[in-house]
A protein has these predicted regions:
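Alpha-helical transmembrane segments and their membrane-interface boundaries
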Residues: 1-74, 78-79, 85-87, 106-154
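Hydrophobic alpha-helical membrane segments
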Residues: 94-106
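The feature identifies polytopic integral membrane transport proteins across all domains of life
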Residues: 86-96
Length: 154
C-alpha cells in the first residue's frame, strides 16, 4: 500500500478547496437555490478529491471517474433528500469537475490539425470517462430510496 507524502496531502487539500470553489461558481451560474450552494460545492469537492486519490493510487482516468462518481452520486442523493431539492441540482453541478472537457477539446483540436491517431486516442479515452460517469450515476440512482415502515407512513 502506498503512503501519501506531506506534499501530496497538501496538494489534495488544495485541489479539494479549488474543486469546491469551481463547483460553487458553476452552481451560482446554473442558478441553483442559495440554500443548496454549500452542498453543491461539497459534492463537487468530494468527487474531485476521490478522483485525484484514485489517480494517485494508480487508476486510469476512466476507472478513477467511476470510483469517484459513485460516492458523488450518493452524496448528491443524500443532499437532495435532506434539502428536499431535486437530485439533478447536486448531480449536474457535482460532476462538473469530472466531465472530460479538455479531452473533448483536444480530440477536436487534433482532428482539425490532421493528427488522426492522437484524435482517435483522445476520443476513445474521453468516451471511456463519459461512459464511466454515466454508468456510475445509473448504478446509484437505480437504487431505491429507503422507505418508512408502512405503519409510519401518512
Amino acid at each position: 500500500m502506498m503512503t501519501l507524502t506531506n506534499a501530496q496531502i497538501g496538494q489534495l487539500a488544495a485541489q479539494f478547496f479549488f474543486a469546491g470553489a469551481g463547483t460553487l461558481s458553476f452552481a451560482i451560474l446554473f442558478a441553483c437555490p442559495r440554500r443548496a450552494l454549500p452542498c453543491c460545492a461539497l459534492v463537487g469537492a468530494v468527487g474531485w478529491f476521490i478522483y485525484e486519490l484514485a489517480i494517485l493510487y494508480g487508476a486510469d482516468a476512466a476507472a478513477a471517474a467511476l470510483i469517484a462518481v459513485i460516492p458523488l452520486s450518493l452524496a448528491a442523493r443524500i443532499c437532495a433528500v435532506l434539502l428536499k431539492t431535486p437530485v439533478t441540482v447536486f448531480l449536474l453541478t457535482g460532476i462538473f469537475p469530472l466531465v472530460p472537457g479538455a479531452g473533448i477539446y483536444y480530440t477536436a483540436y487534433y482532428f482539425i490539425q490532421g493528427n488522426n491517431s492522437l484524435a482517435l486516442a483522445n476520443g476513445i479515452s474521453t468516451f471511456k470517462v463519459a461512459v464511466a460517469l454515466a454508468v456510475g450515476i445509473a448504478l446509484v440512482l437505480g437504487l431505491p430510496l429507503p422507505q418508512a415502515p408502512f405503519w409510519k407512513r401518512k
